[in-house]
Swiss-Prot record, chain A:
GO molecular function, one term: mRNA 5'-UTR binding
Function: A translational regulator that binds mRNA to regulate translation initiation and/or mRNA stability. Usually binds in the 5'-UTR at or near the Shine-Dalgarno sequence preventing ribosome-binding, thus repressing translation. Its main target seems to be the major flagellin gene, while its function is anatagonized by FliW.
Compartments, record wording: Cytoplasm
Gene name for this UniProt entry: csrA
GO cellular component annotations of the record: cytosol
Protein name per UniProt: Translational regulator CsrA
Lineage of origin: Bacteria, Thermotogati, Thermotogota, Thermotogae, Thermotogales
UniProt entry keywords in alphabetical sequence: Bacterial flagellum biogenesis, Cytoplasm, Repressor, RNA-binding, Translation regulation
Assembly behavior: Homodimer; the beta-strands of each monomer intercalate to form a hydrophobic core, while the alpha-helices form wings that extend away from the core.
Main localization category: cytoplasm
InterPro entries, A to Z: CsrA (IPR003751), CsrA_sf (IPR036107)
Protein backbone atom coordinates (compact mmCIF):
# COMPACT_ATOMS: atom_id res chain seq x y z
CA UNK A 1 0.00 0.00 0.00
CA UNK A 2 1.22 3.41 -0.94
CA UNK A 3 0.97 5.88 1.90
CA UNK A 4 1.32 9.58 1.34
CA UNK A 5 0.51 12.78 3.18
CA UNK A 6 -1.69 15.48 1.69
CA UNK A 7 -2.91 18.84 2.90
CA UNK A 8 -6.36 20.31 2.33
CA UNK A 9 -6.69 21.42 -1.26
CA UNK A 10 -4.02 19.04 -2.49
CA UNK A 11 -4.82 16.06 -4.64
CA UNK A 12 -3.39 12.94 -6.20
CA UNK A 13 -3.87 11.38 -9.58
CA UNK A 14 -4.51 7.69 -10.00
CA UNK A 15 -3.75 6.77 -13.57
CA UNK A 16 -4.53 9.44 -16.13
CA UNK A 17 -8.07 10.28 -15.34
CA UNK A 18 -8.83 9.77 -11.68
CA UNK A 19 -8.20 12.65 -9.32
CA UNK A 20 -8.69 12.43 -5.59
CA UNK A 21 -8.71 15.74 -3.78
CA UNK A 22 -8.72 16.44 -0.06
CA UNK A 23 -11.49 18.98 0.46
CA UNK A 24 -11.80 19.27 4.22
CA UNK A 25 -10.43 17.73 7.37
CA UNK A 26 -12.53 17.95 10.47
CA UNK A 27 -11.58 15.95 13.52
CA UNK A 28 -11.68 12.29 12.56
CA UNK A 29 -13.42 12.94 9.27
CA UNK A 30 -11.95 13.69 5.87
CA UNK A 31 -14.05 14.99 3.01
CA UNK A 32 -12.65 13.95 -0.34
CA UNK A 33 -13.64 14.83 -3.87
CA UNK A 34 -13.17 12.30 -6.64
CA UNK A 35 -13.16 13.14 -10.32
CA UNK A 36 -13.27 10.03 -12.45
CA UNK A 37 -14.80 8.76 -15.66
CA UNK A 38 -18.25 7.24 -15.32
CA UNK A 39 -16.87 3.80 -16.01
CA UNK A 40 -14.89 3.86 -12.75
CA UNK A 41 -16.98 2.41 -9.98
CA UNK A 42 -16.73 4.31 -6.72
CA UNK A 43 -18.30 2.67 -3.74
CA UNK A 44 -18.06 3.12 -0.01
CA UNK A 45 -16.38 -0.06 1.16
CA UNK A 46 -18.82 -0.66 4.00
CA UNK A 47 -21.72 -0.61 1.55
CA UNK A 48 -20.14 -3.34 -0.56
CA UNK A 49 -19.41 -5.27 2.63
CA UNK A 50 -23.00 -4.92 3.76
CA UNK A 51 -24.28 -6.41 0.50
CA UNK A 52 -21.66 -9.12 0.77
CA UNK A 53 -22.75 -10.02 4.30
CA UNK A 54 -26.42 -10.01 3.29
CA UNK A 55 -25.72 -12.30 0.32
CA UNK A 56 -23.89 -14.73 2.59
CA UNK A 57 -26.86 -14.80 4.93
CA UNK A 58 -29.29 -15.25 2.05
CA UNK A 59 -27.82 -18.62 1.08
CA UNK A 60 -28.30 -19.99 4.60
CA UNK A 61 -31.98 -20.77 4.28
CA UNK A 62 -33.74 -23.98 5.18
CA UNK A 63 -35.73 -25.26 2.22
CA UNK A 64 -38.38 -26.41 4.72
CA UNK A 65 -39.09 -22.79 5.60
CA UNK A 66 -39.95 -21.77 2.06
CA UNK A 67 -43.60 -22.77 2.15
CA UNK A 68 -44.07 -20.52 5.16
CA UNK A 69 -42.49 -17.61 3.31
CA UNK A 70 -44.36 -18.04 0.05
CA UNK A 71 -47.63 -18.01 1.98
CA UNK A 72 -47.50 -14.23 2.20
CA UNK A 73 -48.95 -14.25 -1.30
CA UNK A 74 -52.27 -15.60 -0.11
CA UNK A 75 -53.39 -12.37 1.37
CA UNK B 1 -28.76 -28.85 -22.92
CA UNK B 2 -26.46 -29.64 -20.05
CA UNK B 3 -27.08 -31.12 -16.66
CA UNK B 4 -25.88 -29.06 -13.72
CA UNK B 5 -25.66 -30.08 -10.11
CA UNK B 6 -27.27 -27.34 -8.11
CA UNK B 7 -28.66 -26.69 -4.66
CA UNK B 8 -32.07 -27.54 -6.12
CA UNK B 9 -30.80 -30.85 -7.44
CA UNK B 10 -29.71 -31.81 -10.93
CA UNK B 11 -31.14 -29.44 -13.48
CA UNK B 12 -31.24 -29.48 -17.26
CA UNK B 13 -30.17 -26.03 -18.32
CA UNK B 14 -30.24 -24.79 -21.84
CA UNK B 15 -27.41 -22.50 -22.98
CA UNK B 16 -29.91 -19.70 -23.38
CA UNK B 17 -30.86 -19.98 -19.73
CA UNK B 18 -27.36 -19.42 -18.44
CA UNK B 19 -26.86 -15.97 -16.98
CA UNK B 20 -23.31 -14.72 -16.79
CA UNK B 21 -22.33 -12.43 -13.93
CA UNK B 22 -19.00 -11.18 -15.18
CA UNK B 23 -17.85 -10.02 -11.77
CA UNK B 24 -19.78 -12.53 -9.73
CA UNK B 25 -21.83 -11.18 -6.87
CA UNK B 26 -20.62 -9.43 -3.71
CA UNK B 27 -19.31 -12.21 -1.49
CA UNK B 28 -19.32 -14.64 -4.42
CA UNK B 29 -16.99 -12.90 -6.83
CA UNK B 30 -15.63 -16.18 -8.16
CA UNK B 31 -19.02 -17.45 -9.36
CA UNK B 32 -19.97 -16.44 -12.88
CA UNK B 33 -22.67 -18.74 -14.16
CA UNK B 34 -26.15 -18.70 -12.74
CA UNK B 35 -29.64 -19.54 -13.84
CA UNK B 36 -33.04 -18.40 -12.63
CA UNK B 37 -35.25 -21.34 -11.77
CA UNK B 38 -38.94 -21.24 -11.21
CA UNK B 39 -40.41 -24.05 -9.14
CA UNK B 40 -44.16 -24.32 -9.01
CA UNK B 41 -44.09 -25.35 -5.34
CA UNK B 42 -42.25 -22.23 -4.21
CA UNK B 43 -43.76 -19.52 -6.38
CA UNK B 44 -43.74 -16.56 -6.20
CA UNK B 45 -40.29 -17.25 -4.77
CA UNK B 46 -37.85 -18.17 -7.49
CA UNK B 47 -34.23 -19.23 -7.37
CA UNK B 48 -30.99 -17.79 -8.58
CA UNK B 49 -28.82 -20.89 -8.61
CA UNK B 50 -25.11 -21.12 -9.17
CA UNK B 51 -24.20 -23.54 -11.93
CA UNK B 52 -20.66 -23.78 -10.59
CA UNK B 53 -21.18 -24.34 -6.89
CA UNK B 54 -23.97 -26.69 -5.96
CA UNK B 55 -24.22 -25.21 -2.47
CA UNK B 56 -25.15 -21.76 -3.64
CA UNK B 57 -28.69 -20.64 -4.42
CA UNK B 58 -30.50 -17.44 -3.60
CA UNK B 59 -34.24 -17.20 -3.03
CA UNK B 60 -35.43 -14.29 -5.16
CA UNK B 61 -38.68 -12.55 -5.91
CA UNK B 62 -40.08 -10.03 -8.34
CA UNK B 63 -39.93 -6.80 -6.29
CA UNK B 64 -43.10 -5.42 -7.84
CA UNK B 65 -45.09 -8.26 -6.33
CA UNK B 66 -44.15 -6.75 -2.98
CA UNK B 67 -44.40 -3.08 -3.74
CA UNK B 68 -45.67 -1.40 -6.86
CA UNK B 69 -43.62 1.67 -5.99
CA UNK B 70 -40.21 0.06 -6.29
CA UNK B 71 -38.03 2.03 -8.64
CA UNK B 72 -34.38 2.64 -9.35
CA UNK B 73 -32.11 3.99 -11.97
CA UNK B 74 -29.60 1.83 -13.80
CA UNK B 75 -26.39 3.74 -14.29
CA UNK B 76 -24.87 4.23 -17.73
CA UNK B 77 -21.96 2.01 -16.77
CA UNK B 78 -24.30 -0.82 -15.79
CA UNK B 79 -26.32 -0.37 -18.98
CA UNK B 80 -23.07 -0.73 -20.85
CA UNK B 81 -21.81 -3.66 -18.81
CA UNK B 82 -25.06 -5.56 -19.25
CA UNK B 83 -25.30 -4.50 -22.90
CA UNK B 84 -28.84 -3.28 -22.36
CA UNK B 85 -30.36 -2.04 -25.58
CA UNK B 86 -34.01 -2.61 -24.91
CA UNK B 87 -35.49 -1.80 -21.48
CA UNK B 88 -38.31 -4.23 -22.12
CA UNK B 89 -35.88 -7.09 -22.22
CA UNK B 90 -34.56 -6.88 -18.70
CA UNK B 91 -35.70 -8.76 -15.67
CA UNK B 92 -35.31 -7.68 -12.07
CA UNK B 93 -35.38 -9.73 -8.91
CA UNK B 94 -34.48 -9.04 -5.31
CA UNK B 95 -32.93 -11.46 -2.87
CA UNK B 96 -34.72 -12.76 0.20
CA UNK B 97 -32.92 -13.53 3.41
CA UNK B 98 -34.83 -16.25 5.19
CA UNK B 99 -33.38 -16.79 8.67
CA UNK B 100 -32.87 -20.51 9.22
CA UNK B 101 -35.86 -21.92 11.08
CA UNK B 102 -37.37 -18.48 11.48
CA UNK B 103 -39.09 -17.66 8.20
CA UNK B 104 -41.37 -15.06 9.79
CA UNK B 105 -38.36 -12.77 10.04
CA UNK B 106 -37.63 -12.92 6.31
CA UNK B 107 -36.19 -9.74 4.86
CA UNK B 108 -35.81 -8.44 1.34
CA UNK B 109 -32.77 -6.69 -0.06
CA UNK B 110 -34.17 -3.80 -2.08
CA UNK B 111 -30.85 -1.97 -2.09
CA UNK B 112 -29.09 -4.45 -4.32
CA UNK B 113 -31.41 -5.86 -6.99
CA UNK B 114 -30.41 -8.51 -9.50
CA UNK B 115 -30.73 -7.14 -13.01
CA UNK B 116 -30.63 -9.52 -15.95
CA UNK B 117 -30.51 -8.64 -19.60
CA UNK B 118 -32.58 -11.41 -21.11
CA UNK B 119 -31.12 -10.69 -24.54
CA UNK B 120 -27.42 -10.79 -23.77
CA UNK B 121 -27.74 -13.26 -20.91
CA UNK B 122 -25.74 -10.98 -18.66
CA UNK B 123 -26.61 -10.35 -15.07
CA UNK B 124 -25.45 -8.20 -12.24
CA UNK B 125 -26.32 -7.39 -8.68
CA UNK B 126 -26.54 -3.64 -8.76
CA UNK B 127 -25.87 -1.60 -5.65
CA UNK B 128 -28.21 1.36 -5.72
CA UNK B 129 -27.06 4.80 -4.88
CA UNK B 130 -30.06 5.70 -2.76
CA UNK B 131 -31.14 6.07 0.84
CA UNK B 132 -34.66 5.02 0.02
CA UNK B 133 -33.93 1.32 0.30
CA UNK B 134 -31.98 -0.96 2.60
CA UNK B 135 -30.72 -4.53 2.52
CA UNK B 136 -33.31 -5.58 5.11
CA UNK B 137 -36.93 -4.69 4.44
CA UNK B 138 -39.15 -6.99 6.45
CA UNK B 139 -41.18 -9.17 4.14
CA UNK B 140 -44.09 -8.91 6.58
CA UNK B 141 -44.15 -5.13 6.10
CA UNK B 142 -45.39 -5.67 2.55
CA UNK B 143 -48.41 -7.67 3.64
CA UNK B 144 -51.70 -5.99 3.16
Amino acid sequence: MLVLARKVGESIFIGNDVEVKILKIDGGEVKIGISAPKSVRILRKELYEEIMAENKKAIEFDIKDISEVSKFENR
Amino acid sequence: MLVFKTKLGELDIDDKEIIVFENGMPGFEQLRKFSVISLKETLPIMWLVSLEDEHIAFPIIDPWILTKDYEFEISDEDVEELEIKDKEKIAVWVILTIPYGNPKETTVNLLAPIVVNLESGKGKQIILNTEKYTTKHKLSSFKK
